[in-house]
Amino acid sequence: MAAAMDVDTPSGTNSGAGKKRFEVKKWNAVALWAWDIVVDNCAICRNHIMDLCIECQANQASATSEECTVAWGVCNHAFHFHCISRWLKTRQVCPLDNREWEFQKYGH
């Protein structure tokens, strides 16, 4: 439970010197988050980047969301790790900007 908060009154008022204007009894904070990427979909399989890739969807019995991670390149493009790995078997470039692919990070 949050502690009571003292609130200063404006210096020009004389109403109730020393009294609190209000007291916070309870505060329920809410926070939201989002990935810091512009594109929400994997450009290779077209699924949402936070959903399973098409390979994991086909093998849903054995796949978990922990296994289907996101991979970022130094170009800041993001793909499912399985999708970009399959792509890199034939071409060593980013599918979106054609620059040489280099992993920046991967994982959730």
UniProtKB/Swiss-Prot annotation:
| ZnF (RING-type) residues | 53-98
Kindly list the positions at which Phosphothreonine occurs in this protein: T9
Q: Which residues carry this modification: N-acetylmethionine?
A: M1
Which Gene Ontology molecular function entries are recorded, alphabetically?
cullin family protein binding; molecular adaptor activity; NEDD8 ligase activity; NEDD8 transferase activity; protein-containing complex binding; RNA polymerase II-specific DNA-binding transcription factor binding; ubiquitin protein ligase activity; ubiquitin protein ligase binding
Residue numbers binding Zn(2+) 3: C75, H77, C94, D97
- At the top level, the lineage of the source is Eukaryota
Transmembrane residues, as ranges? Answer: none
The answer to whether keyword Transmembrane helix applies is no
| SUPFAM superfamilies the UniProt entry points to | RING/U-box (SSF57850)
Q: Name one GO cellular component term.
A: Cul7-RING ubiquitin ligase complex
Q: Which residues form a coiled coil?
A: none
Please describe, based on the UniProt annotation, the reported consequence of changing C75A. Strong reduction in ligase activity
**UniProt catalytic activity:** S-ubiquitinyl-[E2 ubiquitin-conjugating enzyme]-L-cysteine + [acceptor protein]-L-lysine = [E2 ubiquitin-conjugating enzyme]-L-cysteine + N(6)-ubiquitinyl-[acceptor protein]-L-lysine; S-[NEDD8-protein]-yl-[E2 NEDD8-conjugating enzyme]-L-cysteine + [cullin]-L-lysine = [E2 NEDD8-conjugating enzyme]-L-cysteine + N(6)-[NEDD8-protein]-yl-[cullin]-L-lysine
KW Methyltransferase (keyword) present: no
Q: Which key words are in the record?
A: Acetylation, Cytoplasm, DNA damage, DNA repair, Host-virus interaction, Metal-binding, Nucleus, Phosphoprotein, Transferase, Ubl conjugation pathway, Zinc, Zinc-finger
Question: In which pathway is this protein known to take part?
Answer: Protein modification; protein ubiquitination; Protein modification; protein neddylation
Q: Which InterPro entries match?
A: RING-box_E3_Ubiquitin_Ligase (IPR051031), Znf_RING (IPR001841), Znf_RING/FYVE/PHD (IPR013083), Znf_RING_H2 (IPR024766)
Impact noted for substituting H77A: Strong reduction in ligase activity
Q: Give the protein family.
A: Belongs to the RING-box family.
* Subunit (UniProt): Component of multiple Cul1-RING E3 ubiquitin-protein ligase complexes commonly known as SCF (SKP1-CUL1-F-box) complexes, consisting of CUL1, SKP1, RBX1 and a variable F-box domain-containing protein. Part of a SCF(SKP2) complex consisting of CUL1, RBX1, SKP1 and SKP2. Part of a SCF(FBXO3) complex consisting of CUL1, FBXO3, RBX1 and SKP1; this complex interacts with PML via FBXO3. Component of the SCF(Cyclin F) complex consisting of CUL1, RBX1, SKP1 and CCNF. Identified in a SCF E3 ubiquitin ligase complex together with HINT1 and CDC34. (Microbial infection) Interacts with human adenovirus 5 protein E1A; this interaction inhibits RBX1-CUL1-dependent elongation reaction of ubiquitin chains by the SCF(FBW7) complex.
Q: Quote the function comment for this protein.
A: E3 ubiquitin ligase component of multiple cullin-RING-based E3 ubiquitin-protein ligase (CRLs) complexes which mediate the ubiquitination and subsequent proteasomal degradation of target proteins, including proteins involved in cell cycle progression, signal transduction, transcription and transcription-coupled nucleotide excision repair. CRLs complexes and ARIH1 collaborate in tandem to mediate ubiquitination of target proteins, ARIH1 mediating addition of the first ubiquitin on CRLs targets.
Q: What is known of its domains?
A: The RING-type zinc finger domain is essential for ubiquitin ligase activity. It coordinates an additional third zinc ion.
Q: Can you say what this protein is called?
A: E3 ubiquitin-protein ligase RBX1
Question: What organism is listed for this UniProt entry?
Answer: Homo sapiens
Question: Which gene is this protein's source?
Answer: RBX1
